[in-house]
Amino acid sequence: MSYSSGIKNVKYLFIDGGCLDSLLESFSDKLFGKKQLEIDYCRLANGYHKVFYYDCLPAQKQGENQVDYQNRIKPKIKLFNHLKSLDRFHVYEGTARFRDKRRGQEQKEVDIMIAVDMYRHSSRKNMDEATLLTSDLDFKPLIDALVQEGMYVSLWYPKTKANYELVDAADSRQALTVYTVWGWLTEDFRKKVSLPIFEKSSLLPIDDSWTQVDNIEQSTYEVFVYEKENNYIAVFQTIEGDYNLYQHNNLDQLKFFIVHIHSPDVIRYS
């Protein structure tokens, strides 16, 4: 029992904001027409007693004037203020510096703050379970230490974006997919966008009116993509012999979706 109030199974969520940003930006760019995703953070944090969010404001780029810089960081300042206003949420800011065009921005202090806070809450027995959202392999020693201390550690990581050593270190793990993020979106935003429509069929519903326009071939699967009247359908034959069908009106978004859902959660090298 963690609290004197008698609360059982206290769960804290620790979020690497840079990792979460990268995940959301990827889906925005590849699947939702570059629209700014509207996240209901209370949905994201459902089931957790406290949420700790760590990030930093973007560094000013070389040659960037102050007005442009202030306009560029406004959305992140707005996000930080929004998160601070939510019950259970706590925001901690590190610093960043712009190194050069090739290496881009370097984030400082955030990783250390996450490590210190997770270990502190664990050693004080403030929580029974810690969940860390990250894809950074540098956190493996922290997870190892917490597990060895008896803390139950779960890892949330972007699908295909985390090293298997990091994933294997946690007691449990969850790959963050487009379906995960869809569950976090606000109801209003869901009305503005759509995912491919899924259907299972025992027969191939493709006739001569459809034109094959592409195929996606990987080591473990092959998907054929057809078009008719600006509507696209991707056909995946299962090992049972039936067909998984995915329909969408945007070819690039459909192809990204197919590769995303059929890729392994984590890449392992033999």
Residue ranges and their predicted role:
Residues 1-270:
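Terminal and domain-boundary accessory regions
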